[in-house]
């Protein structure tokens, strides 16, 4: 039985997610709420099991986060930015 391989992604503003690219995660820079929602939908369809999301971007999409909070996958984990914790 073959096991499924899942991916890890990082979504947020470009400056905040750059360090994650250096350690090998796939990064997805976004600039607005609509773009964040579209990226999350795409990543959830493309076998991303863990998505790190910057808190400043997460604050723009509370309804979308509430939806994904009820799903098994992907797990969305908020990460603070230089602006501090929400």
Residue ranges of model-derived segments:
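Acidic, metal-coordinating helix/loop segments flanking the phosphotransfer/catalytic sites
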Residues: 38-45
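N-terminal first-folded block
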Residues: 2-37
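Periplasmic-binding protein-like
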Residues: 49-53
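Extended, charged amphipathic alpha-helical "stalk" segments
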Residues: 41, 56, 66-67
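Short secondary-structure boundary segments
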Residues: 32, 54-56, 80
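Glycine-rich nucleotide phosphate-binding loop and flanking beta-alpha elements
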Residues: 58-60
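C-terminal structural segments of small proteins and small subunits
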Residues: 64-86
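Solvent-exposed alpha-helices and their adjacent loops that cap or buttress functional pockets
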Residues: 1-3, 43, 68-69
